[in-house]
């Protein structure tokens, strides 16, 4: 239970349960008020951005899986497939290079259309 100090009309200090709820899941009681632990908040945001990065890369890789299969089988790619492969690889490079330390304000590149 979080306690809040309250001064009575006679000047006595008494402790009572705090009535103000935290604003974020990262708020901690400092004895007088809720204070946001911005380091913890930022750390969680960066972890989420890293997970988002991997999800974007996985989606991009899935979009070229048939092209990869053709290459592994030694088949020649058509010009459109080569172009698509290069475009998606450039996108993956851009996603990989994206700075996640600015989370939650990360600007991700757009996945190229097929």
Curated annotation (Swiss-Prot):
Domain of life: Bacteria
Alphabetized InterPro entries for the sequence: Phage_T4_Gp38_tail_assem, TFA_Chaperone
UniProt similarity note: Belongs to the tfa family.
PANTHER family, alphabetized: PROPHAGE TAIL FIBER ASSEMBLY PROTEIN HOMOLOG TFAE-RELATED (PTHR34413:SF2), PROPHAGE TAIL FIBER ASSEMBLY PROTEIN HOMOLOG TFAE-RELATED-RELATED (PTHR34413)
Protein name from the UniProt record: Putative protein TfaS
Organism this protein belongs to: Escherichia coli (strain K12)
